UniProtKB/Swiss-Prot annotation:
Cofactor(s) the protein needs: Mg(2+)
Entry binding sites for ATP: 11, 72-73, 102-105
Sites where the protein binds substrate: 125-127, 162, 169-171, 222, 243, 249-252
GO molecular function: 6-phosphofructokinase activity; AMP binding; ATP binding; fructose-6-phosphate binding; identical protein binding; metal ion binding; monosaccharide binding
Residue numbers binding Mg(2+): 103
One Gene Ontology CC term in the entry: 6-phosphofructokinase complex
Native organism taxonomy: Bacteria, Bacillati, Bacillota, Bacilli, Bacillales
Function: Catalyzes the phosphorylation of D-fructose 6-phosphate to fructose 1,6-bisphosphate by ATP, the first committing step of glycolysis.
EC nos: 2.7.1.11
Protein name as catalogued: ATP-dependent 6-phosphofructokinase
Cited HAMAP family: Phosphofructokinase_I_B1
Amino acid sequence: MKRIGVLTSGGDSPGMNAAVRAVVRKAIYHDVEVYGIYNGYSGLISGKIEKLEIGSVGDIIHRGGTKLYTARCPEFKTVEGREKGIANLKKYGIEGLVVIGGDGSYMGAKKLTEHGFPCVGVPGTIDNDIPGTDLTIGFDTALNTVIDAIDKIRDTATSHERTYVIEVMGRHAGDIALWSGLAGGAESILIPEADYDMEEIIARLKRGHERGKKHSIIIVAEGVGSGVEFGKRIEEATNLETRVSVLGHIQRGGSPTAADRVLASRLGAFAVELLLEGKGGRCVGIQNNQLVHHDIIEILEQKHTIDQSMYRLSQELSI
Protein backbone atom coordinates (compact mmCIF):
# COMPACT_ATOMS: atom_id res chain seq x y z
CA MET A 1 0.00 0.00 0.00
CA LYS A 2 1.57 3.26 -1.17
CA ARG A 3 -1.21 5.82 -0.70
CA ILE A 4 -3.82 6.20 2.04
CA GLY A 5 -6.49 8.74 2.95
CA VAL A 6 -7.69 10.16 6.25
CA LEU A 7 -10.92 11.92 7.19
CA THR A 8 -12.75 13.11 10.29
CA SER A 9 -16.50 12.69 10.42
CA GLY A 10 -19.52 13.41 12.61
CA GLY A 11 -19.28 15.51 15.76
CA ASP A 12 -15.81 16.90 16.40
CA SER A 13 -13.83 15.99 19.49
CA PRO A 14 -10.62 17.41 21.01
CA GLY A 15 -7.69 15.28 19.92
CA MET A 16 -8.84 14.65 16.36
CA ASN A 17 -5.99 16.86 15.14
CA ALA A 18 -3.49 14.80 17.11
CA ALA A 19 -4.88 11.65 15.47
CA VAL A 20 -4.65 13.17 11.98
CA ARG A 21 -1.07 14.23 12.72
CA ALA A 22 -0.17 10.71 13.83
CA VAL A 23 -1.72 9.15 10.73
CA VAL A 24 0.15 11.48 8.39
CA ARG A 25 3.54 11.21 10.06
CA LYS A 26 3.37 7.47 10.67
CA ALA A 27 2.50 6.87 7.02
CA ILE A 28 5.20 9.18 5.68
CA TYR A 29 7.73 7.50 7.99
CA HIS A 30 6.92 4.30 6.06
CA ASP A 31 7.16 6.06 2.68
CA VAL A 32 3.40 6.06 2.19
CA GLU A 33 1.65 9.11 0.75
CA VAL A 34 -1.32 10.54 2.66
CA TYR A 35 -4.30 12.42 1.29
CA GLY A 36 -6.56 14.46 3.52
CA ILE A 37 -10.27 14.35 2.78
CA TYR A 38 -12.00 17.52 3.94
CA ASN A 39 -15.50 17.74 5.47
CA GLY A 40 -15.78 14.01 6.12
CA TYR A 41 -17.79 11.81 3.77
CA SER A 42 -19.25 14.94 2.18
CA GLY A 43 -15.78 15.88 0.97
CA LEU A 44 -15.19 12.33 -0.20
CA ILE A 45 -18.24 12.61 -2.44
CA SER A 46 -17.42 16.10 -3.73
CA GLY A 47 -13.71 15.42 -4.16
CA LYS A 48 -12.30 17.83 -1.56
CA ILE A 49 -9.07 15.89 -1.34
CA GLU A 50 -5.45 17.04 -1.18
CA LYS A 51 -2.05 15.56 -0.46
CA LEU A 52 -0.72 16.13 3.05
CA GLU A 53 2.96 16.54 3.93
CA ILE A 54 4.78 16.49 7.26
CA GLY A 55 4.42 20.26 7.49
CA SER A 56 0.69 20.04 6.78
CA VAL A 57 0.13 18.71 10.28
CA GLY A 58 2.62 20.89 12.12
CA ASP A 59 1.37 23.00 15.03
CA ILE A 60 -1.96 21.18 15.37
CA ILE A 61 -1.41 18.60 18.12
CA HIS A 62 -2.53 21.10 20.77
CA ARG A 63 -5.52 22.45 18.88
CA GLY A 64 -9.13 21.44 19.39
CA GLY A 65 -11.49 20.76 16.51
CA THR A 66 -10.21 19.18 13.32
CA LYS A 67 -7.95 20.58 10.61
CA LEU A 68 -9.80 18.45 8.08
CA TYR A 69 -13.17 19.87 9.14
CA THR A 70 -16.15 17.60 9.59
CA ALA A 71 -19.75 17.24 8.53
CA ARG A 72 -22.67 14.87 8.66
CA CYS A 73 -23.47 13.41 5.24
CA PRO A 74 -26.86 11.74 4.66
CA GLU A 75 -25.93 11.32 0.97
CA PHE A 76 -23.25 8.79 1.89
CA LYS A 77 -25.98 6.51 3.21
CA THR A 78 -27.16 6.03 -0.39
CA VAL A 79 -25.56 3.65 -2.89
CA GLU A 80 -25.10 6.53 -5.33
CA GLY A 81 -23.28 8.61 -2.73
CA ARG A 82 -20.93 5.80 -1.81
CA GLU A 83 -20.19 5.08 -5.47
CA LYS A 84 -19.18 8.73 -5.94
CA GLY A 85 -16.90 8.47 -2.91
CA ILE A 86 -15.26 5.27 -4.11
CA ALA A 87 -14.76 6.79 -7.55
CA ASN A 88 -12.87 9.69 -5.98
CA LEU A 89 -10.74 7.33 -3.91
CA LYS A 90 -9.78 5.51 -7.10
CA LYS A 91 -9.21 8.80 -8.92
CA TYR A 92 -6.55 9.79 -6.38
CA GLY A 93 -5.09 6.29 -6.18
CA ILE A 94 -5.98 5.95 -2.50
CA GLU A 95 -5.72 2.32 -1.42
CA GLY A 96 -6.83 2.51 2.22
CA LEU A 97 -8.68 4.92 4.48
CA VAL A 98 -8.45 5.94 8.14
CA VAL A 99 -11.81 7.18 9.45
CA ILE A 100 -11.79 9.17 12.70
CA GLY A 101 -15.17 9.60 14.37
CA GLY A 102 -18.04 7.95 16.20
CA ASP A 103 -20.50 5.19 15.40
CA GLY A 104 -21.98 7.03 12.41
CA SER A 105 -18.49 7.39 10.96
CA TYR A 106 -17.88 3.71 11.61
CA MET A 107 -21.05 2.88 9.68
CA GLY A 108 -19.64 4.70 6.66
CA ALA A 109 -16.37 2.78 7.00
CA LYS A 110 -18.36 -0.45 7.22
CA LYS A 111 -20.15 0.36 3.97
CA LEU A 112 -16.85 1.06 2.22
CA THR A 113 -15.49 -2.22 3.59
CA GLU A 114 -18.48 -4.05 2.12
CA HIS A 115 -17.57 -2.48 -1.23
CA GLY A 116 -14.13 -4.04 -0.86
CA PHE A 117 -12.29 -0.89 0.21
CA PRO A 118 -9.93 -1.25 3.21
CA CYS A 119 -10.84 1.05 6.12
CA VAL A 120 -9.75 1.36 9.74
CA GLY A 121 -11.89 3.25 12.25
CA VAL A 122 -10.40 5.40 15.01
CA PRO A 123 -12.78 6.28 17.89
CA GLY A 124 -13.16 10.05 18.06
CA THR A 125 -16.14 11.23 20.12
CA ILE A 126 -16.57 13.00 23.44
CA ASP A 127 -19.39 10.59 24.38
CA ASN A 128 -17.05 7.64 25.07
CA ASP A 129 -19.74 5.36 23.64
CA ILE A 130 -17.81 3.15 21.19
CA PRO A 131 -17.64 -0.54 22.20
CA GLY A 132 -14.26 -2.24 22.07
CA THR A 133 -12.29 0.58 23.67
CA ASP A 134 -12.03 1.86 27.23
CA LEU A 135 -11.68 5.44 26.05
CA THR A 136 -12.46 7.50 22.96
CA ILE A 137 -10.51 10.51 21.71
CA GLY A 138 -11.93 13.69 23.21
CA PHE A 139 -13.67 12.17 26.21
CA ASP A 140 -10.99 13.14 28.73
CA THR A 141 -10.91 16.74 27.49
CA ALA A 142 -14.70 17.05 27.56
CA LEU A 143 -14.74 15.51 31.02
CA ASN A 144 -12.24 18.05 32.32
CA THR A 145 -14.21 20.89 30.73
CA VAL A 146 -17.34 19.73 32.57
CA ILE A 147 -15.53 19.27 35.88
CA ASP A 148 -14.09 22.77 35.60
CA ALA A 149 -17.62 24.10 35.06
CA ILE A 150 -18.99 22.09 38.00
CA ASP A 151 -16.30 23.46 40.31
CA LYS A 152 -17.06 27.04 39.30
CA ILE A 153 -20.81 26.59 39.53
CA ARG A 154 -20.40 25.04 42.97
CA ASP A 155 -18.66 28.22 44.13
CA THR A 156 -21.62 30.41 43.24
CA ALA A 157 -24.12 27.77 44.37
CA THR A 158 -22.50 27.85 47.81
CA SER A 159 -22.48 31.64 47.96
CA HIS A 160 -26.20 31.87 47.17
CA GLU A 161 -27.24 28.63 48.91
CA ARG A 162 -28.80 27.27 45.73
CA THR A 163 -29.44 23.96 44.04
CA TYR A 164 -27.95 23.72 40.55
CA VAL A 165 -28.98 21.39 37.74
CA ILE A 166 -26.20 21.02 35.18
CA GLU A 167 -27.13 19.51 31.82
CA VAL A 168 -24.28 17.83 29.93
CA MET A 169 -24.02 16.13 26.56
CA GLY A 170 -24.95 12.50 26.06
CA ARG A 171 -28.08 11.67 24.09
CA HIS A 172 -27.64 7.92 24.40
CA ALA A 173 -24.59 7.54 26.64
CA GLY A 174 -24.11 8.79 30.17
CA ASP A 175 -20.34 8.58 30.54
CA ILE A 176 -19.79 12.34 30.64
CA ALA A 177 -22.52 12.75 33.25
CA LEU A 178 -21.39 9.78 35.34
CA TRP A 179 -17.66 10.49 35.36
CA SER A 180 -18.04 14.25 35.85
CA GLY A 181 -20.70 13.78 38.50
CA LEU A 182 -18.51 11.37 40.44
CA ALA A 183 -15.42 13.57 40.10
CA GLY A 184 -17.41 16.72 40.88
CA GLY A 185 -19.18 15.35 43.94
CA ALA A 186 -22.70 15.68 42.53
CA GLU A 187 -25.62 14.85 44.80
CA SER A 188 -27.49 13.09 41.98
CA ILE A 189 -26.52 11.86 38.50
CA LEU A 190 -29.12 11.09 35.84
CA ILE A 191 -28.05 9.04 32.82
CA PRO A 192 -29.92 7.44 29.88
CA GLU A 193 -28.79 3.92 30.83
CA ALA A 194 -30.43 3.91 34.26
CA ASP A 195 -33.90 4.61 35.61
CA TYR A 196 -34.20 7.34 38.20
CA ASP A 197 -36.58 7.94 41.09
CA MET A 198 -37.57 11.60 41.17
CA GLU A 199 -39.09 11.23 44.61
CA GLU A 200 -35.82 9.85 45.97
CA ILE A 201 -33.85 12.70 44.37
CA ILE A 202 -36.16 15.23 46.00
CA ALA A 203 -36.01 13.40 49.33
CA ARG A 204 -32.21 13.39 49.19
CA LEU A 205 -32.16 17.14 48.57
CA LYS A 206 -34.52 17.73 51.48
CA ARG A 207 -32.44 15.55 53.81
CA GLY A 208 -29.33 17.47 52.87
CA HIS A 209 -31.07 20.79 53.50
CA GLU A 210 -32.33 19.60 56.90
CA ARG A 211 -28.82 18.70 58.04
CA GLY A 212 -27.55 22.14 57.05
CA LYS A 213 -26.29 21.56 53.52
CA LYS A 214 -26.16 24.94 51.76
CA HIS A 215 -26.09 23.83 48.13
CA SER A 216 -26.53 20.82 45.84
CA ILE A 217 -25.39 19.83 42.36
CA ILE A 218 -27.41 17.56 40.07
CA ILE A 219 -25.93 16.33 36.78
CA VAL A 220 -28.35 15.44 33.98
CA ALA A 221 -27.32 13.87 30.67
CA GLU A 222 -29.28 15.49 27.83
CA GLY A 223 -30.70 12.11 26.79
CA VAL A 224 -32.60 11.85 30.07
CA GLY A 225 -34.54 15.05 29.53
CA SER A 226 -34.37 18.82 29.70
CA GLY A 227 -32.30 20.22 32.53
CA VAL A 228 -34.61 23.23 32.60
CA GLU A 229 -37.64 21.03 33.23
CA PHE A 230 -35.82 19.10 35.96
CA GLY A 231 -34.91 22.41 37.59
CA LYS A 232 -38.54 23.52 37.63
CA ARG A 233 -39.73 20.23 39.12
CA ILE A 234 -37.06 20.29 41.82
CA GLU A 235 -37.76 23.88 42.85
CA GLU A 236 -41.51 23.26 43.03
CA ALA A 237 -41.09 20.07 45.07
CA THR A 238 -38.39 21.27 47.48
CA ASN A 239 -39.03 25.02 47.68
CA LEU A 240 -35.26 25.41 47.34
CA GLU A 241 -33.95 28.10 45.01
CA THR A 242 -32.81 26.25 41.91
CA ARG A 243 -30.84 27.32 38.85
CA VAL A 244 -30.03 25.47 35.63
CA SER A 245 -26.87 25.55 33.53
CA VAL A 246 -26.83 23.87 30.10
CA LEU A 247 -23.18 23.46 29.16
CA GLY A 248 -23.79 22.70 25.47
CA HIS A 249 -21.10 22.77 22.81
CA ILE A 250 -18.37 24.13 25.07
CA GLN A 251 -17.83 20.44 25.87
CA ARG A 252 -16.60 19.77 22.33
CA GLY A 253 -13.99 22.52 22.19
CA GLY A 254 -10.72 23.42 23.79
CA SER A 255 -7.13 22.27 23.65
CA PRO A 256 -6.99 18.50 24.18
CA THR A 257 -5.58 17.19 27.44
CA ALA A 258 -2.27 15.36 27.51
CA ALA A 259 -4.19 12.11 27.90
CA ASP A 260 -6.20 12.74 24.74
CA ARG A 261 -3.12 13.80 22.77
CA VAL A 262 -1.29 10.61 23.71
CA LEU A 263 -4.33 8.41 23.08
CA ALA A 264 -4.96 10.01 19.68
CA SER A 265 -1.31 9.65 18.69
CA ARG A 266 -1.24 5.98 19.64
CA LEU A 267 -4.52 5.11 17.94
CA GLY A 268 -3.80 7.09 14.77
CA ALA A 269 -0.41 5.46 14.30
CA PHE A 270 -1.84 2.01 15.06
CA ALA A 271 -4.53 2.47 12.41
CA VAL A 272 -1.83 3.07 9.80
CA GLU A 273 0.03 -0.05 10.93
CA LEU A 274 -3.09 -2.14 10.38
CA LEU A 275 -3.64 -0.77 6.88
CA LEU A 276 -0.02 -1.45 5.95
CA GLU A 277 -0.46 -5.02 7.22
CA GLY A 278 -3.44 -5.41 4.90
CA LYS A 279 -5.95 -5.45 7.76
CA GLY A 280 -8.97 -3.47 6.60
CA GLY A 281 -12.47 -3.58 8.04
CA ARG A 282 -11.07 -3.01 11.53
CA CYS A 283 -11.39 -0.41 14.25
CA VAL A 284 -8.80 0.38 16.88
CA GLY A 285 -9.11 0.95 20.59
CA ILE A 286 -7.37 0.79 23.92
CA GLN A 287 -8.17 -1.74 26.65
CA ASN A 288 -6.20 -2.00 29.88
CA ASN A 289 -3.73 0.46 28.29
CA GLN A 290 -3.05 -1.99 25.45
CA LEU A 291 -3.76 -1.20 21.80
CA VAL A 292 -6.40 -3.52 20.34
CA HIS A 293 -8.34 -3.86 17.11
CA HIS A 294 -11.70 -5.43 16.30
CA ASP A 295 -13.87 -6.27 13.34
CA ILE A 296 -15.76 -3.04 12.66
CA ILE A 297 -18.99 -4.87 11.79
CA GLU A 298 -18.94 -6.75 15.10
CA ILE A 299 -18.36 -3.51 17.02
CA LEU A 300 -21.31 -1.82 15.29
CA GLU A 301 -23.52 -4.73 16.34
CA GLN A 302 -22.59 -4.24 20.01
CA LYS A 303 -24.18 -1.79 22.41
CA HIS A 304 -22.26 0.56 24.65
CA THR A 305 -22.82 -0.16 28.34
CA ILE A 306 -22.18 1.96 31.38
CA ASP A 307 -19.76 0.89 34.11
CA GLN A 308 -22.26 -0.40 36.68
CA SER A 309 -19.73 -0.47 39.52
CA MET A 310 -18.97 3.20 38.95
CA TYR A 311 -22.68 4.03 38.84
CA ARG A 312 -23.26 2.21 42.14
CA LEU A 313 -20.32 4.05 43.66
CA SER A 314 -21.76 7.40 42.59
CA GLN A 315 -25.01 6.53 44.36
CA GLU A 316 -23.25 5.37 47.52
CA LEU A 317 -21.18 8.55 47.75
CA SER A 318 -24.05 10.96 47.13
CA ILE A 319 -25.98 10.24 50.33
